[in-house]
Amino acid sequence: NPWADPEAEANPEAKATAEATAEAIAEALAEPEPALPALPLLAFLFSLPAVQHWVEKNWING
């Protein structure tokens, strides 16, 4: 699997959390008028190491 992430495979809970977070962010951004109160929440979520790692692995470097 070219998308395999050994660190995430070793911690499936972090992987699931990061994936769910990324899906929630994608859904929020897909709204015609994204809810501005969600911005601090998004900033907090992106500050989490597991989320940063997933984003780097799947969006930036992928």
From Swiss-Prot:
It comes from Pogonomyrmex rugosus (Desert harvester ant). Residues 1-10 have a biased composition (Acidic residues). One of its GO terms (cellular component) is extracellular region. Residues 11-20 have a biased composition (Low complexity). Vertebrate-selective toxin that causes pain by targeting voltage-gated sodium channels. It is found in: Secreted. The modification Asparagine amide is found at residue 61. Its main location: secreted. Keywords: Amidation, Ion channel impairing toxin, Neurotoxin, Secreted, Toxin, Voltage-gated sodium channel impairing toxin. Residues 1-34 form a propeptide. Residues 1-20 are annotated as: Disordered. One of its GO terms (molecular function) is toxin activity. This is Myrmicitoxin(1)-Pr2b. Belongs to the formicidae venom clade 1 family. The lineage of its organism: Eukaryota, Metazoa, Ecdysozoa, Arthropoda, Hexapoda. Expressed by the venom gland. The keyword Secreted applies.
